[in-house]
Each structure stands twice: as structure tokens, then as C-alpha cells.
Design a protein with these regions (language model features):
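Active-site gating loops and adjacent loop-to-helix segments of metal-dependent hydrolytic enzymes
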Residues: 75-107, 150-170, 232-257, 279-282, ...
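Metal-coordinating catalytic core of metallo-dependent amide/deamination hydrolases
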Residues: 137-273
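His/Asp/Glu-enriched, well-ordered alpha-helical/loop segment
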Residues: 252-259, 304-395, 406-408
Length: 466
């Protein structure tokens, strides 16, 4: 009779528990979908498992949590490079999303998830789109953990109008109904591995009534609201219209609370930070997207101040059309370096905080901290094994374990990815996704969409291709 289904032993275990313990020659034991024990390998040696993984020379840590990621935009990689955010949003991505089918969304999501699983992300928050049943199907099939939404909008002022046939262009009532249907269909399915939140697309396109509506619906259904907020290049439109920042506007409406996840938050004032902390609002920081698309998160944002005040800030990669990488190791490096460069303060965000943002703080941002984000008995078995027997990790000392992970680690170092006790990748081989088929279908669909896009003149190589 075996005590466990799976035991990972002889690794350096970064628990991310309340004491932030790191166990040399440690082990993680899994029974079903839960972590059963975390201890020294010698302590668990007399308790057999159905199978074991030898993690000698490897780190064992919680699966990474991406607090912001667009599944339906995986096939838009390359369509939004080097343009202002207004053009990116209304001129590039909205026309792309107008052409998507549910089947397109399914393959786009599998492509997205394959990249995440391969780089150690086990859970992600997707703020949504308009063909989200395809997303729900793909998350269910591939085994990753995620929460997604309908990207709500109901107000279309001059200069901030999506295409006439844009599928998100709905009334307040129709928007709320569309999101509520997704909640009813997908929320807490697949053993509570798939969840649905409410979503708001972008600040110029949201009315008072929609703010109040999503808050009421999210409270009723006990879920989150995801919202792109205070995004430099778009936040000015709200200031001109209502005479205050979007966060101040929302506070005045009485809608803010701990189930809000505000994304980007780059055009942020000190008073906005106080409001966010006062209402226990959660924040998703996407440094790679900000640097790629000049959102101003480091140059104008207040992320060090948020962290200083104790605001829960998760870390994300955004979409492959906005970053264009889903590697959370890369995101950890970015958040640990870009702010200290801008502020000229070398210890501003230490690697330990970057790892917290990618694990336990990300779980808190998504309302999932009771189940994931750390390796502790009783929590869901979302675990990754990282190979440190590589040139970019050597030498490594006890004092540099976390620093090496953040400053030198890469998603390609992830060897094994486990969600709910199920191995999704082992020895770098994906077990739940047919990668060759996903690549073929993804390329085929993307080429079809590109042929239909209205901005053909912008999609020409800058260098000659023979």
C-alpha cells in the first residue's frame, strides 16, 4: 500500500510558505490533487509512493501564477509591435478579434497554454474576449489552471470606437448577460481548475452603469472583476471626461473592493495608490508589456510605492501581441530590474519579492491563495521542477538560490510541470497538448486572419526577404 501517488525527492524545495522555508534535499509528496507532505527527503523516506521523481540538482517550487494573460491573442503575435497603445487597441487588436471564431479561440488558447506550461506557469488570469467558450474548452482539455472573463464594454465615445461589427460592442444589459452566461457555464468546473470572473475591457469604453453592474454581479457570484486600468495613453480620455483618474472615479461610484484585479496601473498617482490600498484592490503588473508598448509602468507608475504600502501586486506577461513572451522567468527578471534602473536604487525590488509576485502574491491577486501559490500540505498540487545543472545557474550558493532563479533562470530550465497532481510536462515533453498539431493549426488560422485584416500595408517586412 503506497502512502502517496507521487513523490518528488532530493530537490531544493522553495516552499513559499509563511516562513519562506527552503529545504535542501527536500521532498514534496502528492496524493490525488493535493500536496500531502513537504519535508526533508530523509523524513519521508519510509513512506512509499506509486512513482517518484528524482529532483537532484533541481529546484522544486510552486507553479508560477501569471496575473494577466490573453488567450485569444496568441495568434496575434507580431501584429501590435512598435505602435502607440491607442492604435494597438483600436486599430490592430480589435480588428483581429472581430475575425475570431470559437474554434480559432480554442487553438489560440492551446498555443498560449503550451508556452505557459513549458515555462512553468500553472495558473493564469485571462481578462477575456468574445469567443470564450473556446477558451473554456481548451483550458479543460490541456489541464492548466485559469480564470477568464467576457471583456465588457458599453460606451463608445468619439475617437474610442471599436469596429462596427466588433463582437464586444453591446449594451450594458447584453454585456452583463454575456458574462453571466460564461459564469454559469464554466465557473468552478474541471475540479475548480477553471473559473470565470467578470471583466471590463478598457477605461474609455465603460459607463457608470457597467461599473456598478459588474460589481453587483461579481459580488453575487463570488468571483473577481478584471479590468485594464490607468493605462497611459488611454487614461487621459477618462480624466478629460470626468475630471479625475479612473480609480478616483470608481471610488466615487462605490464599486471598488477586494475582488477587483486592476491591470497595468501605469498612470498612477499617490492618491490612486492610497485608494487601492484602502479598498484592498489587487493589481496585476506587466513590466514586459509596458516596456514593449511604452505604457509607462516604470517611468510613471507607482509600483514600488504600492509594494511599500502592502498592496497585493501579482505579476503577468500580458499577451503575445503585447509583450511578446509568456515566460514568467523573464517577467521576474524585468520587475526586479526595471524599477531600480529608473529610480537608480539597486535594492528597490529584490529577487525574493519578484518570486513572491509570481507565486503567492499572484495567487492572492486571483483569490486563489487558499489553494495555490505555495507548497504546503492541503494545497493543490501545482508544482514545477527546475533544472539548475546548466551554465546559466553555475555557480550557485545558498545565499544566491533565489537570486539565480530570478536573475539567471529561464523558462527553458523548467523540466516538469504539474497541476492538480497531474503531470502536464515531463522532461520538457508536453503530455496533454499535441504541440505539432497546435503549431500547424495556429499558423494556418493566423495566416487566414492576416489575409482578412484591414491594415495590410503595415504588415510588410522592413528588410528584403528573398
Amino acid at each position: 500500500m503506497t502512502a502517496y501517488d507521487l513523490k518528488i525527492e532530493h530537490g531544493t524545495v522553495i516552499t513559499m510558505d509563511g516562513r519562506r522555508r527552503i529545504l535542501k534535499d527536500g521532498a514534496v509528496a502528492i496524493k490525488g490533487d493535493r500536496i500531502a507532505a513537504v519535508d526533508k527527503t530523509a523524513t519521508l523516506a519510509g513512506q512509499p509512493a506509486a512513482r517518484t521523481i528524482d529532483a537532484t540538482g533541481r529546484l522544486v517550487l510552486p507553479g508560477l501564477v501569471s496575473a494577466h494573460c490573453h488567450n485569444v491573442q496568441a495568434l496575434a503575435r507580431g501584429l501590435g509591435d512598435d505602435v502607440p497603445v491607442e492604435l494597438w487597441t483600436y486599430g490592430r487588436i480589435y480588428p483581429y478579434e472581430t475575425l475570431l471564431t470559437e474554434e480559432d479561440a480554442y487553438w489560440s488558447t492551446l498555443l498560449n497554454c503550451a508556452e505557459m506550461i513549458r515555462t512553468g506557469t500553472t495558473c493564469h488570469a485571462d481578462p477575456g474576449g468574445y469567443v470564450m467558450d473556446g477558451v473554456g474548452r481548451a483550458l479543460t482539455d490541456c489541464g492548466i489552471r485559469g480564470i477568464f472573463a467576457w471583456a465588457g464594454m458599453d460606451d463608445f465615445p468619439k475617437g474610442y470606437e471599436p469596429p462596427a461589427d466588433f463582437p464586444g460592442r453591446k449594451t450594458t444589459e447584453a454585456t452583463l448577460a454575456a458574462n453571466a452566461r460564461l459564469v454559469k457555464r464554466w465557473h468552478k468546473t474541471a475540479n475548480d481548475r477553471v473559473r470565470v470572473s467578470y471583466g471590463l475591457r478598457i477605461e474609455p469604453n465603460v459607463s457608470d452603469e457597467l461599473f456598478q453592474g459588474v460589481k453587483a454581479y461579481a459580488d453575487r457570484d463570488e468571483t473577481l472583476v478584471q479590468f485594464h486600468c490607468l493605462l497611459l495613453g488611454l487614461s487621459e480620455a477618462v480624466k478629460q471626461r470626468v475630471g479625475m483618474s479612473t480609480v478616483q472615479w470608481m471610488a466615487g461610484l462605490g464599486v471598488l473592493g477586494p475582488n477587483w484585479l486592476l491591470v497595468h496601473m501605469s498612470d498612477t498617482s499617490d492618491s490612486d495608490v492610497v485608494i487601492v490600498k484602502t479598498h484592498d484592490v489587487k493589481v496585476a503588473h506587466n513590466p514586459g508589456a509596458s516596456m514593449h508598448s511604452t505604457y509607462g509602468a516604470a517611468s510613471k507608475g507607482k509600483f514600488p510605492e504600492m509594494l511599500e504600502r502592502g498592496v497585493t501586486v501579482g505579476l503577468g506577461c500580458d499577451s503575445t501581441a503585447a509583450n511578446n513572451s509568456l515566460d514568467m522567468f523573464r517577467a521576474m527578471y524585468q520587475v526586479a530590474t526595471v524599477h531600480k534602473e529608473v529610480r537608480l536604487q539597486p535594492d528597490l525590488i529584490r529577487p525574493e519579492k519578484a518570486l513572491e509576485m509570481a507565486t503567492i502574491d499572484g495567487a492572492r491577486a486571483l483569490g486563489w491563495e487558499a489553494d495555490i501559490g505555495s507548497l504546503e500540505p492541503g494545497k493543490r498540487a501545482d508544482v514545477i521542477v527546475v533544472d539548475t545543472r546548466r551554465t546559466n545557474w553555475t555557480p550557485m550558493h545558498d545565499f544566491s538560490i533565489v537570486a539565480n532563479l530570478v536573475y539567471a533562470g529561464e523558462g527553458a530550465d523548467v523540466e516538469t510541470t504539474i497541476v492538480d497532481g497531474r503531470i502536464l510536462m515531463e522532461n520538457r515533453r508536453l503530455l496533454t497538448i499535441d504541440v505539432d498539431k497546435v503549431l500547424t493549426e495556429g499558423q494556418r488560422i493566423a495566416e487566414r486572419i492576416v489575409r482578412q485584416l484591414p491594415y495590410q500595408e503595415t504588415m510588410r517586412p522592413r528588410w528584403p526577404i528573398a
